Amino acid sequence: YVGEGLVASEQPVKQVILTSASSKTAYGAAHLLMKHKNERKLDYQVIGLTSANNKSFTQDLNCYDQVLSYDEIAELGEDKVNWILDFAGNKSLLLNLQNQFVNNIDKLILIGSTDVDAQQDKPHGHLESEFFFAPSQVKKRSGEWGHVGFSERYAKAWHSFAIHMNDKISVAEYSGAKAVEALYHTGLKNKLNNLEINVLKF
């Protein structure tokens, strides 16, 4: 979806900016954007925005060309055509980016809402954006490629990401309601281990 859009864009996109860059969905997308950029010979930078606490971790993933903390967004080139992929759901942040880039945001795609605290904040201002709904894309692509074709492409993308992340993160398993509940409360306190992918079993 994003890769094809970047190829088809009337204006060459120079920056693809991902918010909540330390989240697994974001850096998975970033990995594929880097891979597709090289395969399609496109000329954009994949830039991750994250909290200052997560900046070093996110840089070490090697999924981005550049990683900035949220208080460093002024360093982004204002005169470059941008796509913004939002995984945070922080409207204030998006309004700031929209104001900073003025007419140089070619597309703003709302994908996730990892910033739970920001959901309580309802700032005034209109976002020129569109929603990405994964089930709709799965249905669309399955119709175009067939179930087997979709599964093959999905497996290929996942395999590439898994190999890249193999020495960077580990899998942690939690079994039973109490363990799952404890992990949930750890998440609410924003103390989850970024170096782990959690597998929950009941």
Locations of regions flagged by a protein language model:
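Terminal helix/beta-alpha structural elements that buttress the NAD(P)+-binding lobe
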Residues: 1-202
